[in-house]
């Protein structure tokens, strides 16, 4: 498992409840750009799309792969929403827990799995209060 991008701030801002590994729907040039470490994870947001009944990864900035010709991908938008691949049962569990208990879905890291697929590790997490962050800082 090779980690391609990591959200270090999430460790400080959130308490973990559960973790999930989700696949991503990417095109071939986006996969190559991710494997070349050309994407950042700090601004990512995960939202639920009620029309498609799926989770979307928003603000994932993947620039065009350097060796790709512009004519092969006309009108490419680097920050378009990308769909997360999870079971419907997992999606309903995540959405229900965010609505019921006030937890948030946080993307933690982008990694290449053993089968050479690009995946995202996501947390179901609780936001820490400012006082809890200070206590955590003094302990560490």
Regions found by a protein language model. Name each.
Residues 2-103:
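Ribosome large-subunit tunnel/peptidyl-transferase-proximal elements
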Residues 45-46, 70, 106, 118-119, ...:
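Alpha-helix boundary/interfacial micro-motifs
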Residues 139-140:
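Conserved small/polar residues in nucleotide/adenosyl-binding loops
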Residues 3, 24, 122-123, 132:
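RNA pseudouridine synthases
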Residues 85-129:
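Beta-rich strand-turn-strand
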């Amino acid at each position: 498992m090779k980690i391609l991008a990591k959200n270090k701030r999430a460790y400080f801002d959130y308490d973990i409840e559960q973790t999930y590994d989700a696949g991503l729907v990417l095109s071939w040039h986006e996969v190559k750009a991710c494997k070349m470490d050309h994407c950042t994870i700090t601004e990512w947001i995960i939202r639920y799309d009620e029309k498609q009944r799926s989770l979307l990864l928003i603000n994932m900035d993947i620039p065009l792969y350097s060796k790709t010709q512009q004519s092969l991908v006309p009108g490419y938008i680097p920050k378009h929403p990308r769909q997360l691949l999870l079971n419907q049962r997992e999606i309903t569990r995540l959405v229900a827990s965010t609505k019921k208990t006030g937890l948030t879905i946080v993307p933690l890291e982008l990694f290449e799995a053993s089968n050479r697929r690009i995946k995202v590790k996501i947390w179901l997490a609780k936001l820490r209060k400012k006082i809890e962050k200070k206590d955590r800082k003094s302990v560490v």
